[in-house]
UniProtKB/Swiss-Prot annotation:
Record lineage: Bacteria, Pseudomonadati, Pseudomonadota, Gammaproteobacteria, Vibrionales
Record-stated family: Belongs to the UPF0319 family.
Name of this chain's protein: UPF0319 protein VV0948
Signal peptide per UniProt: 1-19
Keyword Signal: yes
Highest taxon in the source lineage: Bacteria
A Pfam family matched in the record: DUF2057
Alphabetical UniProt keywords: Signal
Organism in which the protein naturally occurs: Vibrio vulnificus (strain YJ016)
Amino acid sequence: MKKMMILSALALFSSSLFAANLTLQKEITPQIVNGEGVTLQEVHNGNRIELKPGHNQIAVTIGQIVFEDGKRRKFDSQPLLLEFVAKPEQALTLEYGKFRTIDDAKKFENNPTVHLTDAQGNPVAFTMVQLYKGGLQGFRDYEREVADYNAQKAQKADSAPLVNHDPKAMDLKTAFKEMTRQEQQAFMQWAMQNLK
């Protein structure tokens, strides 16, 4: 019995010992982490949450005061669902570019952009989708929305691709778009010949 208690305590301690940490910008609120709702006890000082090493899926919302016609108004974003891989004991930060006006907030809503970085400020690859729900949104069930999204994603394996925020892929896409038509064709021929 004594060994069982020691093993249980050790397992509990070791899971938090190797956990990754995600620090969120002040206005970003975690709603769901790996399918589970987030409680206030799980959000540590500095708006930091612990994540398991490996694949993680988090849903966050952004709530910020903005100006509209000279008056202050609270803007609440649609939930953003991010998926990424966290290494053991890795310190990550999730940020976005703050907005001042309701127009800035609407631009963000139409094309949300967030930045996930490691402790050295290097970008971390992630995918992101916006969970949009029209109509009145007084009380949302984020757990249900994420579960529905995951079920739909499992059914449609060949659905539209997620937005990829891998910096290397973005550089390649940008370089390809800047090429002339002839350069693009030459690149495509080279790429087809060198497929693995």
